[in-house]
Amino acid sequence: DAPIVKKIQSFAYKNSLKETDRATYQAMEALIHNLNTMNSRAGAQTPFSSINYGTDTSIEGRLVIKNILLAEEAGLGNGETPIFPIHIFKIKEGVNFDPDDPNYDLFKLACRVSAKRLFPNFSFIDAPFNLQYYKEGNPDTEIAYMGCRTRVIGNAYDPTREIVTGRGNLSFTTINLPRLGIKAQRNIGAFFDSLDELMDLCIDQLMHRFKIQCSKRVRNYPFLMGQGIWLDSEKLTADDTLEEVLKHGTLSVGFIGLAECLKVLTGKHHGESEEARELGLEIISRMRARMDEETKRTGLNFSLLATPAEGLSGRFVKMD
């Protein structure tokens, strides 16, 4: 009769939710474990990967967000913190920022996990430099960051398509600021001359690599291009070259060791002296202006970033 049917339905529903929740957790756990063990990048490295999440309020989306966070919190074998993927939790007022927002509980969970694992990092859609691109109801316009911390959304090549999906960073080269500071021997003018020279060299290198990448064909990238992952790649045939697709990507110059560079040049870093802080801002502003100048000249997306340098920091110290 009706009460029994209702009881059976309730039992089936609760157990289905429980099983789906468990299966989702295992899927997220598998994703994290696979991305830390598969050596498919250049045949010898794990993929440098990142995932951005936090704003999906659907039942399914919330289930995935919750379980990717719980799997990250649990860690790898022996409780080790997973290096990849880089987790970025997107924060938006009306979605997960305030206590009354539908995903506020997931924001609190993200804070708990970050306190233990240092991931996820957090991005703010409402920040003015991100909000200018945001269109409500269009997740493609929600800011996303790559594993290398490249911010991909502005598009000088095609301003009508300032979106995050189907795009990425093509190449970046890092400048060793402490080395330039040491060579300048506290001569600020000499430092900036060396920096300008190195910026020009980096841009030449990025353009050279870009031309090599553009000369490749769709068949050389059967997944990224052949499966239509990159923006406009679905319009190409197997023998087409890639320039019109790759122009949507970014070409980046990174910098490392700003604090150490300031210490060498002034005796103090930006946290110890207002003079050093002003010089630090001048250094970064000069590099940013050079990137903007190149963007205007070429119509390509040149960007500046602070290199994460998980491995490079040690290499540069040894080289110096």
Task: Give residue spans per PLM region.
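Conserved catalytic cores of very large enzyme subunits
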Residues: 1-247, 268-269, 273-320
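Contiguous, well-ordered alpha-helical segments that form the cores/surfaces of helical PPI scaffolds
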Residues: 251-264, 285
